[in-house]
Amino acid sequence: GAIETRDNGKLPSQITPSLREGAWLLDSWYYYAGMCDKFEGKLIPAELPDMHNYMKWEPFGVVAQILPWNSPIGTLIWKLAPCLAAGNTVVLKPSEQASCSILELMDILLDADIPPGVLNVVTGYGHTTGEPLIDHPDVRMVSFTGGTNGGKAAAKIASQQVKPIVMELGGKSPQIVLPDADIDLAVNGVASGIFPAGGQSCISGSRLLIHYSIIDKFTEQLVKVCKRATVGDPLQESTTIGPIANRVHYERILDNIDKAQKEGHN
């Protein structure tokens, strides 16, 4: 967890719980490990007596997996297990902004006697490493997690060879609060939905839709919760919001704040 924290600024408390024994991420590996011998074919009645009609499952072969910077370990775990269980080999491409935790985890997995060539990692930028990986003729399937623009580019490249691609892209998830809501509970829920990982997640509740009849009361209490937040070093226990992962995002946030203030918001 500490390695990923140093990569992307995410608090250890938001990383390590899902990696402990019994947590859902590791449980998913047990689940998919149990599926390895469950892929079965099917015999289908044929129309003609001399016809043999059946269905069987076959691995795609080489699968390219593109990982995001905001949750690299978690994304790797839920991508990798089903892919290997189905008999595929994998080439991982972590984000250039958060590669260290993935490289460390790869060392651990390779020590577990995974056969040579089954699990591979390449690092680099999207345009110099990710795009050629997706375009490589030996890659038969692509799994991409990242921003919407990156997903569009990946889908365009994969489509040139009619490669199947699975994508999990960025979102703008609204949090809706209606008049009959428990305001205290709703305020805490809204704060918990946006502040983890500094709001840098595809599941962050980055839009608020509040009924006009409770907007003043809700806003007042939400501001109080925000003022209790501690922004700082993510490795300090007192910190509740770590740093933004890169300067581009940091400056975009400041620009949005500046625009809001110029429009009369405070």
PLM regions: where:
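A general structural signal for well-ordered alpha-helical segments in protein cores
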Residues: 1, 25-26, 102, 130, ...
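N-terminal Rossmann-like NAD(P)+-binding subdomain of aldehyde/semialdehyde dehydrogenases
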Residues: 1-51, 245
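Class I S-adenosyl-L-methionine
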Residues: 30, 103-110, 223, 258-261
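Conserved helix-loop functional segments at active or binding sites
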Residues: 34-42, 108-111, 192, 196, ...
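Rossmann-like NAD(P) dinucleotide-binding subdomain of oxidoreductase/dehydrogenase enzymes
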Residues: 41-185
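ALDH superfamily catalytic-core signature
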Residues: 135, 141, 149-266
